[in-house]
Amino acid sequence: MFDRTTNESDSNGVSRRWRRVLLNRWLLAGVAAVVLYSLLGFLLTPWILKRYVSNYAAEKLKGIASIVEVSVNPFLFTLDAKDFVLQEADSRPIFAFGRLFLDFELSSLFHWAGTFAEIRIERPSLHVEIQHNGRLNLADLADSFPKSEDSPSTDRPPPRLLVQHAEIVDGSFTFSDQSNPTPATETFSPLNLEFKEISTLPEHKGPYTVKADLPGGGTVGWQGEISLHHIFSEGELSIAGFKLATAWKFAQDELNLAEPAGEMDFSTHYRFDYQKRTPFLVLQDAKFALKELLLTEKGKNAPLLALEAIEVNDMHFDLQARELMVPNIIVRNGKVAASVDEKGLLDWQKLVTLRESTDVNAPIPIASTPTSQPWHLKTGAVNVVNVALDYTDRSRTTPLALAVGGLNIVLKASAEVGGGPVKAIVDGLKLKLSRIALSEAGDGIPLIALDTLALEDGSIDIGSRAITITQVKATKGGTSVVRDKNGQIRLVELLSPGDKGLIKREVIETGKKARAEGKPWSFRLDAFELNGFRVALQDRTFIPDIVYNLKDIRVSLKNLTNDGKTPIDFNTAFKVVQGGSASVSGQVSQIGDHANARVKLIGLSIKPLHPAVTKFTSLALESGNVSASTRVSYHTAKSGPQ
């Protein structure tokens, strides 16, 4: 009896104690707070966020926004939003994502910085559009945001923020231009970005990786380190297989070009720094390549440019030092065409179509003032390998066409641009042209042909206005000089000094301008040689024609200059197919007002002159040779040539 009473008393005591604990107002208040916090976090906050996003977009941004699902874990400090869409009022898309996950860390209290363990955006899509009025849709969106009355100070440090891991997965970027007569749209997808330890804390750097696919199969890769305070980034950037047709779509109304073929590769190590409002950018070991390039004028079949490759290797660019160094440039295997129309306009000048601006308030371009520090440009070696040329000049009275089967060039170049007149030097110039033919436009029969034309050791100094060439050699080839029945020589008419094409006119104008400025161009060619040339001479004013065929023609000229005083040394020799040979050597002044020469004929056949002898005499010339050697001196005086 005593034991049962004692047990009941103990049980009642425990119950009373539990009741006191459970009914403690502080405990009840804590439980109520946790329940309320849970309800606010799990239920009310998602509902508020969904309504706020929708209302804010409609009232402030004048657009449409919606989120299908929002989940908040108030204990883990995570937010998970799915299927967000932001559209313009007419339902055109601006931004969307499949999922946004945020994981906020309480360690922010210890870092004194907002800390996110994870920011993850899945399947985001950004639509950037240039509208019909020329404005960017994002600019209109930015204008819709409420403006702060107090402009922030540019010197104020950014909010303290630390993101331990951020990732964009399977994103897409769509760019559209509706301002041109021919609208264009391209989408870059998939786009993947990853950042680690990204922070606005001073001198805090974190690694990043960016990968994206380009339209048509190209790729973009970008990795390195980044800091947001101060702004700094260093790493590797690469673009592979970028199709030129992608860029052409957005510029086709400004270009008189059909859709181009070709792709671009680019890679570089870079370092970017922004301190005290001054940007620093250095590119090292940069490589650039254009492959299978094909440019064709709209409405034309023949391409203006067709190249297997343009390669630039080991470039160095320094924005602060204002210098660009290119150790190696290679252009190889292809063809370049150019044509001048009747008005003297080069077809390459017509590739850019200028549209008249209808904006009366458009600013008037102001001439830029030279900066104190010029840009320094330098190329170590430029190599052009096996490139054919086609040039047609219809600005002449008789249009001419020049065809070169193969062009090879080696040169070095340097330049200073800005801070005064342009200074540029080309040296170490070597040039070789193969299979050269000059003909009337539209006529495939060459007027003059050369197997090769080679230039050795040339230099061009634009600052000093000087052109110097050590030697020019031409080999083989030939021409025909025909006097027709009317006594006209077509070749002489075609190459008449009075028939000036575009290039010759521009050279003459450049020379006149330089002389007017008191700093004329100087030119010097130490030696010119022609070997193995052939000339067919024919006079059709006689019946039968008088014909001479010259072969193995050798011409040597030395000291060709425009200094106005140095005489030109010449030496020429040839053989005659009909029999005999001849040579002429001596000196002639630059303007031809005096000359001294030695002429030598050995066994020159005069039998081809039979038609002339028959026409003017009653004699018949059956055979004969002439051999002679003489000196000739010529000069002009007031009374005439002597």
Spans of model-derived segments:
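Extended terminal
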Residues: F2-G30, P159, E225, F317-R322, ...
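Acidic/polar low-complexity surface segments
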Residues: L345-L346, Q488-I489
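Short, solvent-exposed beta-strand/turn "edge" segments of beta-rich domains on protein surfaces
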Residues: N256-P260, T278, S618-E622
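A short, amphipathic edge element
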Residues: L61-V68
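Elongated, acidic membrane-bridging lipid-handling scaffolds
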Residues: F145-E254, E259-E263, Y274, V331-N333, ...
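N-terminal type II signal-anchor transmembrane helix
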Residues: F2-L61, E234, L244, K343, ...
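Flexible beta-edge/linker motif
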Residues: S71-R135, A139, P152-T174, G235, ...
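Surface-exposed loop/turn segments flanking beta-strands in extracellular/periplasmic regions
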Residues: A139-K147, Q349-D359, V492-L502
